[in-house]
C-alpha cells in the first residue's frame, strides 16, 4: 500500500493526518528528520479530507503524521533497554483498543477521549503518551 493510500485509510477511519518528511536512509540526521512534519502549523492543517490528502502526498512517499488532539495514544517503546510491553502489562494487563505496530517496532494504542498532558515515561519505563497538540507516525492500515 502506498503512503497516500495509507493516509487516506487513516482519514476514512476518522483520523486527521498530515505529511511528515520521508525516510531517506543514509542521509545524515534521517532518523530525526523523518519524524518531523513537512510544515509548521500542522495542528491546524491536519485533515481527514481525501482530496486534500491526495493533493498533499501526490506520488511522494511522505511519512504519515496522525494528529492526537481528541485522542490519547500510548506509545509503547521496545528499544534502548526500555521494555514498555512489560510496563504496560504490569499496569493494565492487556490491550482493549485499536493497537498498531509503530514504525520503530513498538506499539501504539489508540484511545478516544479527553486530552491529557504529553509525557515521556511517567506511566512506566518505555511508555509515552501523545495527546493534545501531539502526533504519532502511522503505519499502513487496511
List the model feature ranges, each with a label:
Residues 1-142:
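Conserved phosphate/metal-binding and DNA-contacting active-site motifs used
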Amino acid at each position: 500500500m502506498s503512503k497516500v493510500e495509507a493516509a487516506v485509510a487513516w482519514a476514512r477511519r476518522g483520523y486527521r493526518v498530515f505529511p511528515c518528511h520521508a525516510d531517506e536512509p543514509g542521509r545524515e540526521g534521517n532518523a530525526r528528520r523523518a519524524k518531523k512534519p513537512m510544515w509548521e502549523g500542522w495542528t491546524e492543517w491536519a485533515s481527514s479530507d481525501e482530496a486534500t490528502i491526495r493533493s498533499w502526498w501526490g506520488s511522494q512517499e511522505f511519512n504519515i503524521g496522525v494528529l492526537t488532539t481528541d485522542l490519547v495514544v500510548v506509545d509503547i517503546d521496545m528499544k534502548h533497554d526500555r521494555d514498555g510491553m512489560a510496563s504496560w502489562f504490569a499496569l493494565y494487563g492487556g490491550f482493549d483498543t485499536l493497537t498498531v505496530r509503530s514504525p520503530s517496532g513498538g506499539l501504539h494504542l489508540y484511545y478516544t477521549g479527553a486530552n491529557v498532558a504529553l509525557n515521556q515515561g511517567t506511566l512506566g519505563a518505555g511508555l509515552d503518551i501523545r495527546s493534545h497538540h501531539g502526533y504519532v507516525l502511522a503505519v499502513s492500515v487496511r
